[in-house]
Design a protein with these regions (language model features):
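PLP-dependent aminotransferase class I/II
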Residues: 1-102
Length: 102
């Protein structure tokens, strides 16, 4: 975050990582969980795959499905301590080492 973000309370920071494939994403998600680092998949694996939208007609959504399978929301919030950022970074490095495709 920059000083621009720090001075604006209406800005909501977020960080989304996009990985090469779903298998890598799943590995990274698990390794981060093992380190106690939470991740988010804000839109599940595509809204059209959610039970609430199961009956809503839609056409093919290959880009949505591809991106939904490969992204993770990483922790980033106002007040994130330097210690927490370093812990997240260390967890990502461990995940990188474990995920061959990354």
């Amino acid at each position: 975050l920059t000083t621009f973000h720090a001075s604006r309370k209406q800005v909501t920071p977020y960080w989304i990582a996009l990985f090469p494939d779903a298998a890598t994403t799943d590995i990274v998600e698990q390794v981060l969980e093992d380190h106690g680092v939470g991740t988010r998949r804000w839109w599940s694996r595509g809204c059209h795959r959610m039970p609430a939208y199961a009956d809503v007609p839609h056409g093919p959504l290959p880009v949505t499905e591809d991106v939904a399978d490969r992204y993770l929301g990483l922790p980033l919030y106002r007040g994130l301590s330097e210690e927490d950022a370093e812990r997240i970074h260390a967890a990502l490095l461990d995940a990188r080492d474990r995920a061959e495709a990354w």
